[in-house]
Amino acid sequence: MKVLVASNNAKKLGELRTILENAGLSSVEVVPLSAIDAYDEPVEDGRTFADNALIKARAGAHHSGLITIADDSGFAVEELNGMPGVLSARWSGQHGNDATNNELVLAQMKHVPEERRHAAFVSVCALVTPDGDEHIVEGRWEGRMLTAPRGANGFGYDPLFVPAEEDAAGTGRTSAEMSPAEKNAISHRGKALQQLVPIIAGYSTFF
């Protein structure tokens, strides 16, 4: 069975392959978006992570005729009513500018005390079949937001985020101070992808 991932991100593709192999589903072939001819990526104009994930998964399934998985993720700060949320990549108005995005959210949270700095990374994955079946799963990585960035690994809001697991262990590292392997083992995307395993397994006898 082939499963299209609506992305060319090697990390996302590899993470799903590893999860499927560990679940005994090594016969499932993970196909990148680059393998699909004449594909026009849809506009992600949804109001929620689920909206955007479904937009991408529906487009992929319709165009390719394959079961398609897509994800949308971002940084959600409780004090900011869950924002930056779906606007995480362009929070400062410049798409993909991590430095200015971080500066803006830090400024917005400047006077917020420690006890009100709860934040989470959120990943929503959608799986859509060519027949129109749709499944939505969500992974959350809970923690808190710092008052200044720390760490050189990762990207996005990683330097501002201390996972709850780090606080529980007494180490207090940001996700930008963790190794990629440590981060992937407990991250929001991994948690979401794990929930797709039984769904994919259920379709493996039909496609």
UniProtKB/Swiss-Prot annotation:
Cellular-component GO terms for this entry: cytosol
Molecular function terms from GO: dITP diphosphatase activity; ITP diphosphatase activity; metal ion binding; nucleotide binding; ribonucleoside triphosphate phosphatase activity; XTP diphosphatase activity
Pfam name, any one: Ham1p_like
GO biological process: nucleotide metabolic process; purine nucleoside triphosphate catabolic process
Amino acids binding substrate: 7-12, 73, 155-158, 183, 188-189
InterPro entries: dITP/XTP_pyrophosphatase (IPR020922), ITPase-like_fam (IPR029001), RdgB/HAM1 (IPR002637)
EC class name: hydrolase
Cofactor(s) for this UniProt protein: Mg(2+)
Keywords: Hydrolase, Magnesium, Metal-binding, Nucleotide metabolism, Nucleotide-binding
Residues annotated for Mg(2+) binding in this entry: 72
Record-annotated disulphide pairs: none
Highest taxon, organism lineage: Bacteria
Catalytic reactions of this protein: XTP + H2O = XMP + diphosphate + H(+); dITP + H2O = dIMP + diphosphate + H(+); ITP + H2O = IMP + diphosphate + H(+)
EC number of this enzyme: 3.6.1.66
PANTHER family on file: INOSINE TRIPHOSPHATE PYROPHOSPHATASE, INOSINE TRIPHOSPHATE PYROPHOSPHATASE/HAM1 PROTEIN
Family designation: Belongs to the HAM1 NTPase family.
Name of the protein in question: dITP/XTP pyrophosphatase
Annotated source species: Corynebacterium diphtheriae (strain ATCC 700971 / NCTC 13129 / Biotype gravis)
